[in-house]
Amino acid sequence: MEEGLQRCFVLHRRPYSESSLILDVFSEEYGRLSIISKGARSKRSNLKGVLQAFTPLLMKWSGKGSMRTLRQAETISLGIPLTGINLYSAMYINELLVRVVEQETPYPALFLDYLTALTELAQSTNPEPALRRFELALLSAMGYGVDFLHCAGSGEMVSPEMTYRYREQQGFMASIRHDPLMSFKGNELIAISERRFTTPEQLKAAKRFTRIALKPYLGGKPLKSRELFLPRTRSILK
């Protein structure tokens, strides 16, 4: 079966045989797919420079099962310009998708969230807000539902100045005891819910929450993208 042209991004690529590539692709309509591009590494290939990460693509493939065969690929536009810490941040996002998102499952809204995150990274000097927003969008797409605006114990709206302790499978409970990892201020929970961070403390709180929530999906295996980071970038994504 051959599909029509689909909007895609290459998340990861690796050499296969003497002249081919195996691509991990994130498509708007079909989600993550493994696609073999035969002859893409040969000197005469017209795909040289096309199958790159962070470049919006139109792709057509054929076949069924766990490995499709690329039939056509073309760029929609130039690659999204990412350098330095923002490039490392985008690599982190790609690895999150590879590790967390199951293949063959459509996530059209998450595809747009991914495009938005890359665009924000290209335009920002601080990648943290874009990273936190994408992590929260990813968790939402995975069905990780958390009510940030109501106390799980009383059902009342969270108070900006009160402290709440996060309990997995339950939500946020009002607490007078502070836990460095699991406690959050009400204003931090409101900021996370709105995906709008106005203070460094709110960003740090969002990072703590996404690390807690993503841990079951990532297990104990470290993210390889972090090994590439300079010491100053590790502080953002650790």
From Swiss-Prot:
Cellular component terms (Gene Ontology): bacterial nucleoid
Origin superkingdom: Bacteria
Q: Which GO terms describe its biological process?
A: DNA recombination; double-strand break repair
Q: Which key words are in the record?
A: DNA damage, DNA recombination, DNA repair
In terms of Pfam families, this protein maps to:
RecO_C, RecO_N
Q: Does the keyword Cell membrane belong to this entry?
A: no
Check the record and name the HAMAP family matching this protein: RecO (MF_00201)
Per the record, the similarity remark reads: Belongs to the RecO family.
Role description: Involved in DNA repair and RecF pathway recombination.
Write down the NCBIfam families for this protein, in alphabetical order. Answer: reco
This protein is called DNA repair protein RecO
> Which species is listed as the source?
Aliivibrio fischeri (strain ATCC 700601 / ES114)
| Gene field | recO
